[in-house]
Amino acid sequence: MNITNPNGDRKAVVIFSGGQDSTTCLLKAIADYGVENVEAVTFQYGQRHAIELEKAKWIAQDLGIKQTLIDTSVIKTITANAMMDNIKITKDEAGMPNTFVDGRNALFLLYTAIYAKGQGIRDIITGVCETDFSGYPDCRDVFIKSMNVTLNLAMDYQFNIHTPLMYLTKAQTWQLADELGALNYVREHTHTCYLGVEGGCGSCPSCILRENGLQQYLASKQ
């Protein structure tokens, strides 16, 4: 991987799930900041499948990144959705999928900011995306910008929330991984499947989005 490190000695923390998007963000952060200046925060929020946490742990260790696991599973007691409960994936009348976890990204950003301030870190990186965001309201740029202001005011600290994938399609996210020299790494080691199937089930919305994006990118290279 080409380490450009344009940020000098600045440090960054990546919200990291072990999925395609957050792993691509982690790899980009390593290129931009240097591996010694990057940390990862992973959340146990009551997700149905342990494979997600296992992948995140393995990748962090493989890349030499300090990983901090934060337990926010209390959210499971106050909300229900297909990410935490054994229910069929559906959409409501407005088109919102029941894989949406109310408050999840707000909670992740809050806890990451608390951790970051304690470590003297100002740059927070998250892989949310408004282009292929499945209708999740907390993946929108307007939410991230609002949360950035709120966190700065709440803690009297200058956080900078970076969203390198915000306006990329899934195909462009694969392209970014390729430009980082990590296309095969992301293909082989990340987990995206909502059903927790190793290598992907191929039929859930997340697997379909991932595979369609990959095929679009590979076709564009020919």
UniProtKB/Swiss-Prot annotation:
Family recorded in the similarity comment: Belongs to the QueC family.
Protein name: 7-cyano-7-deazaguanine synthase
One Pfam family this sequence matches: QueC
GO terms, biological process: queuosine biosynthetic process
Entry-linked NCBIfam families: 7-cyano-7-deazaguanine synthase QueC
Organism of derivation: Mannheimia succiniciproducens (strain KCTC 0769BP / MBEL55E)
Gene that specifies this protein: queC
InterPro entries referenced in this protein's UniProt entry, alphabetically: QueC, Rossmann-like_a/b/a_fold
EC number(s) reported in the record: 6.3.4.20
Recorded catalytic activity of this chain's protein: 7-carboxy-7-deazaguanine + NH4(+) + ATP = 7-cyano-7-deazaguanine + ADP + phosphate + H2O + H(+)
